[in-house]
Amino acid sequence: MAGETLRKIQSLLGEMVASFIFGFAVYSAILGSTIAQQPAAKVIIGLTVGFSAIGIIYSFSDVTIAHFNPAITLAAILTGKMGILCGLGYMLAQCVGFILAVCALLVCSPVGYKETLNVIRPAPAPFGADNLNVFFTEFFLTAILVHIAFAVAVNPYRPKVDTDGKFVDPDEKEPVDRRITAPLCIGLTLGFLAFMGLVTSGGAFNPGLTLAPVIMSNTWQHFWLYLGAQYLGGLVGGLLQVFVLYKLSSN
């Protein structure tokens, strides 16, 4: 009993640390490329998002769920892939991790508190995007991410077996083992999605990453737009994979 409790605590702590590392990496890339006025700022941010995610998932998947994204976790809860209390615990750990990442960035930042938060806080890109553009961009980006995360990690295809462990469908073949490639797949997905929202929402598709600088700056403009789109998009992506695009058995 004590061992199980310790494992749960370790898993929650691992999810918090994973979220902290991801948040610190992404926030640092955004701040650094903005201050340095890097012409390749968007490329730097996109690569940071993708590469950091790959390393984090490989490092933490033995200890925790390694979602570091409340939209994925909420979709897992609402599709029955995770218990409610357990999932809410992970979501809280993720949010705490992202808030700590903002705090760490503020200590490291060479510019002021307000300026730092203004740079990393998600906001519509300065190209004339309206609320509808932002909402649907975040909706689709999060839906794509969650669908792929479900397909390769949260709810990968598993053929039905009988009591002897044999496939119920005699024509069934051994499924592809995605445990090795799933972190790479998810990281690359995060990377290409980061480029897709450049001219509208900025490409956040992570409620924890969005909410932390909003809380720290106490500036709530647009936050409902991002969070609503991200959670709704995540739910649609999860439902689509679980109930529509999960491979059907012939039996």
From Swiss-Prot:
InterPro entries found in the cross-reference section: Aquaporin-like, Aquaporin_transptr, MIP, MIP_CS
Keywords, in A-Z order: Cell membrane, Membrane, Repeat, Transmembrane, Transmembrane helix, Transport
Side of membrane Cytoplasmic, spans: 1-11, 64-86, 155-179, 246-251
Position of sequence motif NPA: 69-71
Membrane topology type: Multi-pass membrane protein
Motif (NPG): 206-208
Location of this chain's protein in the cell: Cell membrane
CC terms in the record's Gene Ontology section: plasma membrane
Membrane-spanning segments: 12-32, 43-63, 87-107, 134-154, 180-200, 225-245
Keyword flag Cell membrane: yes
A Pfam family that the UniProt record links to this protein: MIP
Function: Water channel required to facilitate the transport of water across membranes. Involved in osmotolerance.
Comment, domains: Aquaporins contain two tandem repeats each containing three membrane-spanning domains and a pore-forming loop with the signature motif Asn-Pro-Ala (NPA). In microsporidia, the second signature motif differs slightly and is Asn-Pro-Gly (NPG).
Protein name: Aquaporin
Protein source organism: Encephalitozoon hellem
